[in-house]
């Protein structure tokens, strides 16, 4: 059994060295001491734990009862592209302390239940897997595993600036997503005094760095805000990571947890569930409630854009904004975010819109949770301003039209009064002309009557004057001519006077008509 364990340790060390030795990383490297002699010496401390049976523990997952038979499995090897980071960049790999809740499944399966098949995590990177007795030579469970999928703790420059790790009890609750106080107490009650004597400060320091790198979500937001140089490539990367995340992440819902991420081969690679089992509220390391609209992406080692990051210098943390950028006035003191970003979610804002958002506190609060709603609000405001401007312009045009119509009405009223005066003058002139016509008709009738009388008188005179006797007739004719001549002269004079009076009346009427027309 001891020889088989040493051979397994040597093979796993060769695989780690072959996968990490050829990688080129831009981050500063630390010495990673994986000493086979140290691991072999740890086998001497497993016998005290295998002498007495451990207390019974409730099963963690459906896979805990799988018989230890060699079955085919599909797992991703550790020879993935390691240009993103090297194992040399991690802090010294020491055995994890029993009080640190790496994973309930890992602790119970590796340190207490020899019959459970250990995971690659406990076989390769945790010395606690050497205490599993006969179970250390058993193959891993049949499942689809990712080895180095979520690498977010290898940033040495981040870990130097992180805060202190939270209490271990809160970490255990956040990891399991349910009430695991009984299991954590069981794990804490069995310290391995022989091996950890004198090493506990180093172990706690290393695990504090690991958990601090996980729990400091503000630094992880920097990775989430990286969108890539090309928009299409960035969207493809996001979809790829979200699909891989959806297929293998742990979900805590009412106490049930999936162990598809349990076999991560990196040291201290703990999947911390950020959702509460009762209310589903996301929480940070310090206990404050994070915004509900935020979406965190896992940093996959096989993502095509991870080779472009340079975690060595702090300038690489200032990444271009992407679909997960946010606006938060509280981030002004963190140094890794500006006052406002140009892009929120899938909505892009112009400089004028950013000024409006900065001026309005409500919009600044809403834009963190729902940037599309802020976009709609700004669009509604712009449309309302345009409609108001159109209404104002329309009212001004109507007022101008009213003024024009009023001036036209006054002009038309003046013209109407003038036309009324003209019509009155024409009516008077027409009446005068009628009177003149009647007078002329009367004069014509008088002339006709006078001419008839003259003709009758001539006939009568012819009858009276006969020729009984030419002599007498000659003498009488001369006397009659002398007597008739005065009468004829009188009638002619009367007719002439009447004719003159008619002409004078006509002249007077024409003068009056001309005078009225001139007025």
Curated annotation (Swiss-Prot):
The record's Gene Ontology biological-process terms are:
negative regulation of gene expression; positive regulation of gene expression; reproductive shoot system development
Compositionally biased spans, kind Basic and acidic residues: 187-202
Chief subcellular location equals nucleus
Report the GO terms under cellular component.
nucleus
Cellular location of this protein?
Nucleus
Q: CDD domains in the record, alphabetically?
A: bZIP_plant_RF2 (cd14703)
What does a knockout show? Answer: Increased size of rosette leaves, increased plant height, increased number of floral buds and increased length of siliques.
The coiled-coil segments of this chain are 386-460
Q: By its UniProt entry, which Pfam families does this protein fall under?
A: bZIP_1
This protein's record includes keyword Methyltransferase: no
**Top-level taxonomic group:** Eukaryota
Molecular function GO terms recorded:
DNA binding; DNA-binding transcription factor activity
- Composition bias type Polar residues, residue spans: 149-173, 330-339
Amino acid composition bias (Low complexity), ranges on this chain:
244-268, 317-329, 473-483, 490-509
- Pro residues composition bias: residue spans: 51-61
Return the InterPro entries for the record.
bZIP (IPR004827), bZIP_RF2 (IPR044759), bZIP_sf (IPR046347)
The UniProt annotation puts the region (Leucine-zipper) at 398-433
The record's keywords, sorted A to Z, are:
Activator, Coiled coil, DNA-binding, Growth regulation, Nucleus, Repressor, Transcription, Transcription regulation
Annotated spans, Disordered: 1-30, 45-83, 108-202, 222-295, 315-339, 465-519
Q: In which tissues is it expressed?
A: Expressed in inflorescence meristem, floral organ primordia, gynoecia, ovules and carpel margin meristem.
Where is the stretch described as Basic motif? Answer: 372-393
Functional summary from the UniProt entry? Transcription factor that acts as a repressor of reproductive development, meristem size and plant growth. Acts as a transcriptional repressor in inflorescence tissues. Interacts with well known regulators of meristem and gynoecium development such as WUS, HEC1, KNAT1, KNAT2, HAT1, BEL1 and NGA1. Acts as a positive regulator of JAG and OFP1 expression in developing gynoecia.
Further information in the entry reads: Plants overexpressing BZIP29 exhibit altered reproductive development, such as a reduction in the number of floral buds, reduction in ovule production with underdeveloped transmitting tract and altered or aborted development of ovules.
Q: How does it assemble?
A: Interacts with WUS, HEC1, KNAT1, KNAT2, HAT1, BEL1, and NGA1.
Record PANTHER family:
BZIP TRANSCRIPTION FACTOR 30, TRANSCRIPTION FACTOR POSF21-RELATED
Q: Under which name does UniProt file this protein?
A: bZIP transcription factor 30
């Amino acid at each position: 059994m001891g020889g088989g364990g040493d051979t397994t340790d040597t093979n796993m060390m060769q695989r780690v060295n072959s996968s990490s030795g050829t990688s080129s990383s831009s981050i500063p490297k630390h010495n990673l001491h994986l000493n086979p002699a140290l691991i072999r010496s740890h086998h001497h401390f497993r016998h005290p734990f295998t002498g007495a049976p451990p207390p019974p523990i409730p099963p963690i997952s459906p896979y805990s009862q799988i018989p230890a038979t060699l079955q085919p499995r599909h797992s991703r090897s550790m020879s993935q592209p390691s240009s993103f980071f090297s194992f040399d960049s991690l802090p010294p790999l020491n055995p994890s302390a029993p009080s640190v809740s790496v994973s309930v499944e890992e602790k119970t399966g590796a340190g207490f239940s020899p019959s459970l098949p250990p995971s690659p995590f406990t076989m390769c990177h945790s010395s606690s897997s050497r205490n599993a007795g006969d179970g250390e030579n058993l193959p891993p469970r049949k499942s689809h595993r990712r080895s180095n999928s979520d690498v977010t703790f290898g940033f040495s420059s981040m870990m130097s600036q992180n805060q202190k790790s939270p209490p271990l009890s809160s970490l255990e609750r956040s990891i399991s997503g349910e009430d695991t106080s009984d299991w954590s107490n069981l794990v804490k009650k069995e310290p391995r005094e022989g091996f950890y004597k004198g090493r506990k400060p180093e172990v706690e320091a290393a695990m504090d760095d690991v958990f601090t790198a996980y729990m400091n979500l503000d630094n992880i937001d920097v990775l989430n805000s990286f969108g890539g140089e090309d928009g299409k490539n960035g969207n493809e990367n996001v979809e790829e990571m979200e699909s891989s995340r959806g297929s293998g992440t742990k979900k805590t819902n009412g106490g049930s947890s999936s162990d598809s991420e349990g076999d991560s081969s990196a040291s201290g690679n703990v999947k911390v569930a950020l959702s509460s089992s009762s209310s589903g509220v996301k929480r940070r390391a310090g206990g404050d409630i994070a915004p509900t609209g935020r979406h965190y992406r896992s940093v996959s080692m096989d993502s095509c854009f991870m080779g472009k990051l340079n975690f060595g210098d702090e300038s690489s943390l200032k990444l271009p904004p992407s679909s997960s950028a946010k606006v938060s006035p509280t981030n002004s003191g963190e140094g890794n975010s500006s006052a406002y970003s140009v892009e929120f979610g899938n909505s892009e804002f112009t400089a004028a819109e950013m000024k409006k958002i900065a001026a309005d506190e409500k919009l600044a609060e809403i834009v963190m949770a729902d940037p599309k709603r802020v976009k709609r609000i700004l669009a509604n405001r712009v449309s309302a301003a345009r409609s108001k401007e159109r209404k104002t312009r329309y009212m001004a045009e109507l007022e101008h039209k009213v003024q024009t119509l009023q001036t036209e009405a006054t002009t038309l009223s003046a013209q109407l009064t003038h036309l009324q005066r003209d019509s009155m003058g024409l009516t008077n002139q027409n009446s005068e002309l009628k009177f003149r016509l009647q007078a002329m008709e009367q004069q014509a009738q008088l002339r006709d009557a006078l001419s008839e009388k003259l003709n009758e008188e001539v006939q009568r005179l012819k009858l009276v004057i006969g020729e009984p006797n030419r002599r007498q007739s000659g003498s009488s004719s001369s006397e009659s001519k002398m007597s008739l001549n005065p009468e004829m002269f009188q009638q002619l004079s009367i007719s002439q006077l009447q004719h003159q009076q008619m002409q004078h009346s006509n002249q007077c009427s024409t003068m009056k008509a001309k005078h009225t027309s001139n007025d």
